[in-house]
Amino acid sequence: ATDVKKSIVSSVPPKVLTQRDNFLIKRIISSEPEIKVELFDNGTIDNDTISLYHNNEQVIKKGKLNYQPLTYSFNCGNQAVAHELILVAENLGEIPPNTAIMVVTIGKKRQEIFLTSDEKKNAKIIIDYKPNK
């Protein structure tokens, strides 16, 4: 019998992920299963609106970035080894391009990642889950 590896991402990506470039901003390795993602506007609040996809599934739909975070949490425990998070600009706000700060909290570690997206380019983060043995 042959082993079939589970696909990292769901089989059919939405058009917004295939018709724009998905620019890899950062790759993070995590041994902790609990991941928390918070998204804020970077700088001036200018009505930037984003969507966030986790392995091709929309998890934040047309969220408006401001000083209060848009929050998404997930557990890597039973899921794919690689977790692809893609930030999509739904508009450019009043001051293009669409800019965001993504704060990724893994265990006690916190990382701030600066993201830029527009109508041609999405921002991608990959979190590789590698549990301690």
Residues of each region from the PLM?
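Terminal leader/tail segments of proteins
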Residues: 1-133
